[in-house]
């Protein structure tokens, strides 16, 4: 009986520390993905500058420029030299395994795309609203226009946002 009581006390004391380690691991995964995506974007931007497409807006019905790069045999679409936030582009650049990372995107050339590690609460969902509610993801996007809250913003440069409150 004494052994069971001692084990129970140890479990109660150790469980919060174990849960914090899991949370820290999820946050570390997301920070690693953010760093890798920023680095990949830097390399892609350099290649886009060499090709002469770093100052071209993304292709759309209004713009027929070829703002794409062929990287490792895969065509990657760009917006001013940076990776457009779609699942296909991110997977092509990052080589993220589907069994370890979920990527959801809105389909817009401006994004956002949500990157979720396997251990996060929103990994299994296919709903962007559920991913946002999980509060454990990396979002990657461009501002759609040049003004946010009355202040000008640069719509040519991507935004990386870590949400870790739910991790």
Can you name each region flagged by the protein language model?
Residues 1-25, 29, 36:
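N-terminal single-pass transmembrane signal-anchor helix
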Residues 32, 36, 60-62:
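Hydrophobic alpha-helical segments of small multi-pass membrane proteins
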Residues 39-57:
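Alpha-helix exit/C-cap motif
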Residues 51-167:
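Periplasmic/extracellular, small/polar-rich flexible segments of pilin-like filament-forming proteins
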């Amino acid at each position: 009986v004494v052994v069971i009581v001692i084990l129970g006390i140890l479990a109660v004391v150790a469980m919060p520390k174990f849960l914090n380690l899991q949370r820290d691991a999820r946050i570390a995964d997301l920070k690693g993905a953010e760093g890798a995506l920023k680095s990949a974007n830097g390399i892609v931007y350099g290649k886009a500058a060499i090709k002469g497409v770093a100052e071209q807006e993304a292709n759309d019905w209004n713009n027929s420029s070829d703002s794409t790069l062929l990287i490792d045999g895969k065509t990657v679409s760009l917006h001013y030299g940076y990776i457009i936030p779609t699942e296909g582009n991110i997977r092509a650049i990052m080589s993220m395994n589907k069994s370890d990372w979920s990527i959801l995107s809105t389909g817009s050339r401006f994004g956002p795309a949500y990157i979720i590690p396997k251990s996060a609460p929103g990994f299994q969902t296919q709903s962007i609203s559920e991913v946002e509610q999980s509060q454990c993801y990396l979002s990657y996007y461009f501002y759609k226009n040049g003004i946010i809250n009355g202040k000008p913003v640069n719509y040519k440069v991507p935004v990386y946002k870590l949400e870790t409150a739910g991790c």
